[in-house]
Structure formats: C-alpha cells, structure tokens
Design a protein with these regions (language model features):
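Active-site bordering "gate/hinge" segments
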Residues: 1-197
Length: 197
C-alpha cells in the first residue's frame, strides 16, 4: 500500500472566464495550506483598441473616447487624459477647476468602492450587504447626477478646465449624501470585519 503526504502547496487557476469575474482575466494563485504565497495576474483579454481609435481623432474627441473606457470610473480616465494634454500644451488649469475635478473624482471613487463592496459581498453570498451597499451607492450617483447632469459618463472635463460648477444646491446635496454615507461606511466596516458569515 502506497501512502502519501497530503498535498499542502498547490496552484489555483481562476479565469480567464469565471462567474465571479466581471471582466476576463487569468489569475494563478499559489497557496500553501491556507496562505496565499504568490499570485500571477494576466489581463488584456478585453483589449478594445482605444489607442488605435485615438489615433484618428483630435484632442477634444479623444476626451469623449477615454471617458468611455470604464463606466464606473469615467471621470478619472478623462482627468488623466486632460492632465496629460494640458501638460503637453503648457496650459495651467484654474484652481477652482482643479478642485472641481478632485470633487468629482472623489465622489466617483466612493461610488466605485460601494459598487465593488457589493460585488464582493454578492460573490461571498452576503446578499444583504450587497443590497445595502448598492442602495447607498445610489446616494452618490444621485449627487453626481445633480452636479454633472449625468449618472455614468459625467463629462465634467474640458481641456483646460471643467464644464460644471458647484452651486449652493449641488453643495448641499453632496454634503447631505456624505453625511448619510459616513456612518453607513463605518457600519459596513463592522459587518465585514466582525460578522460570522
């Protein structure tokens, strides 16, 4: 009779197509018992040719193109592009426009974090946390819509500035959303770190 030692070290391949992945990607996770010892990530399965598409457009048209790289984080792509073009052209963006770009980016970041918290909760089978985080994400999306006029591609950037301004009504709506979300995020942190699920 042949006896073997239990295999403690092994690799777990995930992807490129997997129900838990929202975008195609290949991950090779090496584990030693319960400890992840290495991870190899291979992306690029969803290459869309943005670079090639940009070659045939002008500077302004490309701003709209890069906004559509990702529906969740459209503003930050457009901001990065705008900053690059502005630096190349030697254009200085007014401080208020810089502040507005940061405000939209931070609201977008909160929206993204709540979205992915919900996705992670859903994949872990924690449907209540999924529903709560997506419900609360709507407060940020509503604030962004009231601020920029759009819920997905905010289209707030112009080369050299921004298309939107913050008035009293927008400021009040944004602060109200943030006041609502602050205790909720602390609650989510408690749920994620202490819940027995």
């Amino acid at each position: 009779m042949v006896t073997r030692e239990p295999l403690e070290t092994f690799s777990v391949p995930i992807g490129p197509q997997h129900p838990a992945l929202k975008e195609p990607g290949h991950f090779l996770i090496s584990v030693d018992g319960e400890i992840v010892t290495d991870a190899v990530v291979r992306l690029g399965y969803a290459h869309r040719g943005i670079e090639k598409a940009a070659e045939g457009r002008n500077w302004v048209q490309n701003l709209y193109l890069v906004e559509r790289i990702c529906g969740i984080c459209s503003h930050i792509h457009a901001t990065a592009y705008s900053l690059g073009v502005e630096r190349l052209a030697g254009v200085e963006v007014p401080p208020r426009a810089q502040a507005i770009r940061v405000l939209v980016a931070e609201l977008e970041r909160i929206h993204s974090h709540l979205l992915w918290l919900g996705v992670a909760a859903h994949e872990a089978g924690f449907e209540t946390l999924f529903m709560y985080s997506w419900r609360d994400r709507e407060t940020i999306m509503d604030a962004l819509e009231g601020f920029t006029g759009n819920r997905v591609n905010y289209s707030a950037n112009l080369l050299g500035g921004v298309k939107v301004d913050v008035g009293d009504e927008q400021r009040t709506a944004i602060l109200k959303a943030l006041d609502y979300l602050e205790p909720r995020t602390h609650h989510y942190m408690d749920v994620v770190t202490t819940d027995a699920l």
